[in-house]
């Protein structure tokens, strides 16, 4: 695929082919407070700022996702509000009316986060609203998303510190205590189970924020045990929001989803790729899934 920064400049003899995707990018929040605990590999667990629901809600309300698409993806993408936007197991009522800084400020104040004139940050007791927003230093798109989103959040008195690190360093030190710019997106709802079930807390890159909600676990377990796809999708959707709780923005707000990338390809003008589907996260090459439909249209 062509990187977003280059997707506007396709060679004259070629054509641009755009494949929609659920290849998302978002901010995973550490959900537990810092109580000095460590993962099996010694990585510290918890963050006293992101463990506060009001902080997570405020970040979600501050993000102008259309601007993130324009700036970080050069316009080749769409806003993201969940891990599987538009797929049958996604809860469509999760779209956030954002940016809404007035609402975000109200939530922060009600939760006890008061702005200090000295540095402009909010504090809850002695705790400043400051945390690292870590991304793999080799990924320019995630770097831009981190930097732009940090500026969007700053007027709230929240300081997200964009920090580029190697994946090895992220795993050793940051995975469970920093907010992380991650990418997911799958053709299978099983990914939702890995991302949000408490039994996968601290399991690799999936539920690295140690998210745990008993009601969400019950919905996810019911989805896997369902007798048919329709029944399963109802439970997958309920895990995101069931009217009372969920992992999504109406509930625990465990992520701040940002964008879904468009997969852009440059092909010969004579090549017809047929009806393209929806691409998952970037690993693999799903544009070839309909290879038998490809046609050469020139003599």
Residue ranges and their predicted role:
Residues 1, 88, 113-186, 263:
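Ligand/substrate-recognition segments at binding pockets and active sites
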Residues 2-11, 186-191:
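A ligand-binding cleft/hinge motif common to bilobed small-molecule-binding domains
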Residues 4, 51-53, 99-100:
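Aromatic- and glycine-enriched glycan-recognition loops and surfaces
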Residues 8-26, 117, 127-128:
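Aromatic-rich, solvent-exposed beta-strand/loop patch
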Residues 17-25, 60-96, 100-105, 141-151, ...:
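Detector for C-terminal structural segments
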Residues 23-55, 71, 260-262:
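A bilobed periplasmic-binding-protein/Venus flytrap-type ligand-binding module shared by bacterial periplasmic
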């Amino acid at each position: 695929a062509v990187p977003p920064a280059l997707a506007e400049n396709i060679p004259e003899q070629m054509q641009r082919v755009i494949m929609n995707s659920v290849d998302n990018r978002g901010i995973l929040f550490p959900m537990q407070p810092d109580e000095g605990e460590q993962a099996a590999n010694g990585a510290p667990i918890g963050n006293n700022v992101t463990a506060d629901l009001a902080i997570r809600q405020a970040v979600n309300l501050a993000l102008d996702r259309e601007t993130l698409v324009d700036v970080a993806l050069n316009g080749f993408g769409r806003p993201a509000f969940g891990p599987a936007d538009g797929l049958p197991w996604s809860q469509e009522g999760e779209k956030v009316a954002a940016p809404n800084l007035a609402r975000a400020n109200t939530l922060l104040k009600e939760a006890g986060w008061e702005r200090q004139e000295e540095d402009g940050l909010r504090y809850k007791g002695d705790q400043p609203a400051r945390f690292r927003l870590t991304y793999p230093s080799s990924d320019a798109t995630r770097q831009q998303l981190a930097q732009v989103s940090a500026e969007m959040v700053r007027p709230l008195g929240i300081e997200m510190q964009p920090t580029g690190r190697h994946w090895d360093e992220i795993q050793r030190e940051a995975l469970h205590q920093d907010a992380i710019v991650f990418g997911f997106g799958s053709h299978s709802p099983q990914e939702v189970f890995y991302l949000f079930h408490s039994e996968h807390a601290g399991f690799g890159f999936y539920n690295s924020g140690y998210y745990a909600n008993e009601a969400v676990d019950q919905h996810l377990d019911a989805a896997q045990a369902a007798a048919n796809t329709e029944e399963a999708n109802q439970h997958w959707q309920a895990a995101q929001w069931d009217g009372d709780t969920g992992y999504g923005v109406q509930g625990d707000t465990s992520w701040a989803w940002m964008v879904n990338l468009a997969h852009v390809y440059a092909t010969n003008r004579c090549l017809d790729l047929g009806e393209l589907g929806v691409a998952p996260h970037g690993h693999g090459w799903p544009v070839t899934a309909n290879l038998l439909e490809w046609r050469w249209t020139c003599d």
